[in-house]
């Protein structure tokens, strides 16, 4: 049975109310996304125990951290915290900064060691230096390492890359992605950056005005029209997890496999076998009720079925689609196209994908 992070908080302020209920997998990276003032940081403070919600419940795996009778303070919660600023101790070496939390963790509870954390975060050559000798990105990697060396059950990250430029963000994101895969430490990551979100997210929570607007896997949320206002029209469509299976040098293409289906994209400088997340915009999806009768320039045509049709505005419609691989994708079509196709739930269709965006090609990353 999968461990879950369960949380329910109600907090009232003169001009803002937080009212959320979450049931999240205690694995992978959960990204809390929303505009400024949506309640992201307040939620993180409640999860960490920095703030006690008057009406609150929190449980991770089999441990209750807050209910009507219980409130475990932050220092007893086995939580790692990483903020926008690295907050390193200037008088200590990088090694001593890293060991600060480790030395305050009971020996029996130390699941991670300095050498393995330093290796994963590429800090080995920095251990004897002082913080002032490090770049902003290096300092933030040290802050992440210090949090990990407390052997936390949960790592909370509050916009940790917000103060860094795009180049440094691009350097740090791969390290964050490795944390969960290497150490199996679940992460709750707060951001309002779409670039960071698309690089990192496994499970997504959209907050708006203190409430959960949408929650689910990245595939579910990006193919759901309910996310339209929060993530923007330009993001709706599909996010697919694929793996590189072959490079076609003659035609300059890379073959991507996912769940028994295939996509072809321009040649990528990525090794065969490596995973690659791709984004498909709903307006780059066209539909047909029959396979192409002749040769077509569209390389990516997938079989699927219609789940439902919705109205976006008087001239545009959304079509929720399930690919044969079981993955959701959203298409945006005109009213005229809908009339021509006469789409019905359950109807087999063919999805023509005109453009695919690779996540490592996102602007600035």
Question: How would you describe each model-predicted region?
Answer:
Residues 64-80, 104:
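ABC ATPase NBD coupling module
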Residues 149-153:
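A short, proline-enriched helix->beta-strand linker immediately N-terminal to the Walker B motif
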Residues 63-68, 109-126, 177-178:
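Conserved ABC ATPase "signature" region
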Residues 130-134, 138-140:
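Conserved ABC ATPase signature
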Residues 181, 191-261:
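Internal alpha/beta loop-helix hairpins
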Residues 155-159:
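Catalytic Walker B motif of ABC-type/P-loop ATPase nucleotide-binding domains
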Residues 262-310, 335-365:
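Glycine/charge-rich catalytic "coupling/switch" loops of P-loop NTPases
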